[in-house]
């Protein structure tokens, strides 16, 4: 099976501070891949390097067969990315933000956006400044999904979402994956990975410590947090 993502010996540092160190992993096309670890483990740095938002020190990254540096703009057209923090102009309406995200890609996503907003119970008539954290997350999810990309990358997508919306969110992921998409889910919530992901990678202190199927032993995983705090 083809790989949607191939990372080889990725290293990224921030001066004297740790980023990621010699990370290598592959994500198969059609996978729901869990990227899990404590906060500060290097998950977001890896994702931003994948998308070309960070210039990494050494290594190579291929996304959908394209080079993450040379083909940066092409990759962004094929990827739906949701960052861990959703920032929008407070004065804009939800509907305006969603339409703007589609217009940037030169696409008409009205029908898909409407379906997503209904599934996520998102009121598009409100202004961003009126929204709770959870509803801002919903806007970010719609912006990442509405163009039906080949690869979804979600960074801590469910924080602030109530249980019903979390369930609906994962139903949407399963729907798109059944149509041929691939999903990377970066999270620190082990239960999400065990319930929804097919495969997973665990990061700690900038290093990939484990690659395994997504049935991860809870005691083993909690030890990473305990060791991190010592």
Task: For every predicted segment, state its role.
Residues 59-67, 74-75, 210:
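Conserved ABC transporter NBD signature motif
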Residues 113-130:
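Conserved ABC nucleotide-binding domain
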Residues 141:
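Hydrophobic anchor residue at the start of the ABC signature
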Residues 152-156:
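Catalytic Walker B motif of ABC-type/P-loop ATPase nucleotide-binding domains
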Residues 163-165:
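Helix N-cap at the start of a conserved alpha-helix in ABC-type nucleotide-binding domains
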Residues 200-213:
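H-loop (His-switch) and adjacent beta-strand-loop-beta switch element
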């Amino acid at each position: 099976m083809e790989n949607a993502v191939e990372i080889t010996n990725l290293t990224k540092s921030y001066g004297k501070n740790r980023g990621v160190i010699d990370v290598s992993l592959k994500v198969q096309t059609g996978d729901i891949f869990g990227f899990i670890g404590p906060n500060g483990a290097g998950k977001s740095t890896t994702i931003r390097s994948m998308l070309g938002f960070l210039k990494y020190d050494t290594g190579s990254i291929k996304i959908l067969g394209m080079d993450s540096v040379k083909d940066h703009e092409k990759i962004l057209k094929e990827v739906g990315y949701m960052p861990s923090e959703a920032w929008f102009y407070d004065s804009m309406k939800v509907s305006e933000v969603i339409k703007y995200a589609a217009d940037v890609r030169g696409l008409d996503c009205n029908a898909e956006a409407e379906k997503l907003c209904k599934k996520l119970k998102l009121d598009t008539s409100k202004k961003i400044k009126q929204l709770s954290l959870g509803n801002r997350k919903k806007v970010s999810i719609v912006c990442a999904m509405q163009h039906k990309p080949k690869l979804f990358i979600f960074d801590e997508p469910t924080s602030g979402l109530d249980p019903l919306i979390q369930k609906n969110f994962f139903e949407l992921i399963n729907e798109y994956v059944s149509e041929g998409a691939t999903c990377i889910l970066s999270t620190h919530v082990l239960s999400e990975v065990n319930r929804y992901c097919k495969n997973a990678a665990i990061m700690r202190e900038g290093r990939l410590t484990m690659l395994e199927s997504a049935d991860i032993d809870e005691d083993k995983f909690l030890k990473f947090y305990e060791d991190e705090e010592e």
